[in-house]
A protein has these predicted regions:
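Solvent-exposed, non-transmembrane regions of integral membrane proteins
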Residues: 1-328
Length: 328
């Protein structure tokens, strides 16, 4: 309770909640506005990715930039300059890591470097918070390590949550920037490239499931001429409802995934094949798990445990006869 300065940990929390509220309202308005407009005027419009990317992205960028500063600020009155001095190394490392990943993925839009650097800044900023809390660089390694182990669980929970956010942002930016889609007509023996891999179409095979029939396509995946994986993709027909579906084949390489989907057959005997390369996509889900773990660790802090009040013992009123006998 009490008053606090804008530059403080309380101020950072207020800024966090304000930006999240405005961002949520923006998404809600963009989702419901077409429905409301159609109900009132019968006019149909579409609100798609351009609107959400322009508004939500620009709203979240300041928040992502401010997140590492929050734990560095003191309660009531913080020192922004001191926080900057503690985070400049993390910012430099984040920029270098962003550039390395950008060029490792063969480039892309220049703004992608900003997004990647911001993601790494969240990760390195969370580690920097633990580093300075433990006193590394000011104390001997043994003392700093002891202090690190003695930090409250809420400190580790906060760092985990911020690292998880950075990992999720890394996955979102990487997929948005470096994702490739290849649509090609293939016949058995033909090849296609995606994500540095060469896929060879080996042919089709009929299959039977418990309640469907399917045509399965087999692909061999090679890297530098060496077979590293294979994948099946199929088109199914559920016999009861006569409902066709396409089952994409998915292969995971580290934190990236390759999707292979069968399209329509062509008149010349070929088959349309769609191949998606989604680099770092698993970071989106990994970051979510890390954020959840951070919340669990924070809630397990002994300082946040609420004690159960002990029941008062019932006092039994003495019987008058027993009191008289005791007095005698």
């Amino acid at each position: 309770g009490g008053l606090f300065q804008p530059i403080s940990r309380e101020g950072a929390l207020v800024l966090n909640n304000l930006i999240l509220t405005v961002s949520a309202a923006t998404v809600l308005i963009g989702t419901l506005y077409p429905l409301l407009l159609e109900t009132l005027t019968d006019e149909k419009i579409s609100v798609g990715p351009p609107f959400f990317n322009l508004t939500f992205g620009f709203l979240m960028a300041p928040l992502l930039l401010a997140v590492p500063f929050g734990p560095m600020l003191a309660w009531k009155r913080g020192d922004l300059l001191a926080a900057l001095q503690r985070l400049y190394l993390a910012a430099g490392l984040a920029l270098v890591a962003g550039l390395v990943l950008f060029y490792a993925e063969n480039g892309g839009p220049v703004l992608a470097v900003v997004g990647l650097a911001m993601a790494f800044f969240l990760i390195f900023g969370a580690l920097a918070d633990l580093w300075f809390r433990a006193g590394f660089g000011k104390q001997t390694a043994s003392i700093a390590w002891s202090r690190l182990k003695g930090l409250p669980r809420s400190a580790f929970g906060t760092s985990l949550a911020h690292m998880g956010l950075g990992i999720t942002v890394l996955g979102i930016v990487a997929v948005t920037t470096f994702e490739t889609e290849t649509v090609v007509e293939m016949k058995p023996g033909m090849t296609a490239e995606a994500g540095g891999f060469v896929l060879t179409f080996d042919g089709m095979r009929a299959g039977q499931g418990p309640n469907y029939t399917e045509d399965r396509g087999h692909f061999t995946i090679r890297k530098a001429g060496v077979a590293v994986a294979d994948v099946w993709s199929s088109k199914r027909l559920y016999t009861a409802r006569r409902m066709p579906t396409t089952e994409a084949g998915i292969v995971t390489f580290g934190l990236s995934q390759l999707y292979v989907s069968l399209g329509d057959p062509m008149a010349d005997g070929g088959l349309v094949v769609r191949i998606w390369w989604k680099p770092w996509i698993l970071c989106i889900w990994l970051g979510t798990v890390v954020m959840m773990a951070g919340g669990v660790v924070s809630l397990s802090d002994r300082r946040l445990r609420v004690g159960v009040p002990k029941r008062r013992a019932k006092v039994v009123a003495p019987v008058p006869g027993q009191v008289a006998e005791a007095a005698e």
